[in-house]
């Protein structure tokens, strides 16, 4: 149980640290909807795929928020420069991409978390 306790403490501390930071990390962790939206867009980007608003709405459980909530959060990410909204192959649809700097921060977060979880295991 001590090992599980240490892991939970580590995850909690990482979460608090991310929330205290300014910029992308704090905004990313501001709600479960923010976290999941970034992950869905980042997963698509890392897979060299494009993802548009309609696809995102279909992927997210309805408990994550309404269409307007999802649109507002995505627009906030774009307005802050953490994501971009570009024209896709189908000229009628706009696709979302996580900006390179934000993707680097996500990668760093996962790398640090993986390392710290190994340290307590």
Language model features: what each stretch is:
Residues 101-121:
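Short, amphipathic alpha-helical interaction segments positioned at domain boundaries
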Residues 63-79:
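Short amphipathic alpha-helical interaction segments
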Residues 11-41:
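Short alpha-helical segments that sit at the start of domains
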Residues 78-88:
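A short, conserved structural fragment
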Residues 1-11:
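An acidic intrinsically disordered interaction segment
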Residues 87-96:
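Short, Lys/Arg-rich nucleic-acid/phosphate-binding segment
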Residues 47-60:
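Short acidic, hydrophobic short linear motifs in intrinsically disordered regions
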């Amino acid at each position: 149980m001590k090992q599980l306790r240490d892991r939970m403490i580590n995850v909690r501390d990482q979460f608090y640290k991310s929330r205290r930071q300014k910029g992308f990390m704090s905004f990313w962790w501001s709600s479960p909807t923010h976290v999941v939206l970034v992950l869905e867009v980042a997963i698509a980007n890392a897979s060299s795929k494009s993802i548009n608003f309609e696809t995102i709405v279909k992927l997210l459980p309805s408990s994550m928020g309404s269409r307007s909530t999802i649109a507002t959060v995505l627009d906030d990410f774009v307005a802050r420069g953490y994501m971009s909204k570009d024209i896709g192959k189908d000229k009628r649809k706009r696709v979302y991409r996580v900006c390179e700097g934000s993707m680097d921060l996500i990668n760093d977060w996962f790398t640090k978390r993986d390392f710290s979880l190994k340290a307590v295991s």
